[in-house]
Amino acid sequence: MYIRKSKLQYHAKPEKSNPIIARRLQEILGGQWGETTGMLAYTLQGWNTVGNEKYKDLLLDTGTEEMGHMEMLATMINDLLHDAPTDTIEKLARNSDPATAAILGGMDPQHAFVNGLGAGLSDSNGNPWSANFIISSGNLLADMRFNVVRESQARLQVSRNFLQTEDKGVRDMLSYLMARETQHQLQFLKACEELEEKYGPVVPHGTQDLQKQGKEFTHTLYNFSEGEAAQALEGETARDGNKFHYSSDPIMAGGEPDLTAAPEILRNTPPEDPSTAVEEGRRMLEGEQNTCLLYTSPSPRDAHES
């Protein structure tokens, strides 16, 4: 269950209105690596973690914190849009020529048209947030590695936003978010370290016997480009304790493919006698229909009568 507190987790008050900054913050709220992604990814991972209370609590605590970050960003965006030039936005809605669009000066029109001068779950270009951004695989190590990437990308974008604004209030909030994302990176890295020690560095563990190939495939870096800079890995130790090898000539062990061509009619190649094209197409369609009939399940009524 969740209990809502009326106070924000941290300050979220700009010095003055600025719809351009509001648009930039949308990336941190509803972009691919934003707080919405963090909140829902960690929460779903936590719900799906059964039998490991340590990591379950870690994920759910962090996911709940991210919800507070979403609230802070939505609050900040609302304040930044206060006194936004709605008359200019209305003109843009009626006239899509480039000159009118330029008047907008970088503001996100969806803030007015869709959200009524409020925040939305979309990125800085108005693309809607998608559940495709999150990962919850059931494999803790794989998920924790995704979480490290998510926090790294999020902190990268927050720091860039920080450097592109002079508003002290916005900077104060962004500085706080960077600090928390530092903690989250470190905690997920620690979780990865613990899980690797227990299960090994390769996901999923326990599948080595499924690999028929030897180390010429599992621990060899192939050179697929000009230059030999990657040769520096030769002899280095991988995280599983084995040595890396370098091959300047990639192995070609599969042979040349031997495929059967599709019927000419399917490749848009007309038959030798064009007059037979219609009849040939009809035969193909009838064959498809007959095939479909073979796999059609009986209706409940037919099943009952039989």
Pin down the residues of each PLM region.
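Conserved alpha-helical segments that form or flank metal/cofactor-binding pockets of metalloenzymes
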Residues: 2-4, 63-117, 188-195
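Alpha-helical bundle segments that constitute or directly flank the non-heme di-iron/ferroxidase center
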Residues: 18-51, 64, 68-72, 137-165
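Inter-helical turn/loop segments and adjacent helix faces that build the functional surface
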Residues: 48-54, 160-174, 195-198
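C-terminal accessory extensions/subdomains outside the catalytic/core fold
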Residues: 211-294
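Conserved small/polar residues in nucleotide/adenosyl-binding loops
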Residues: 295-300
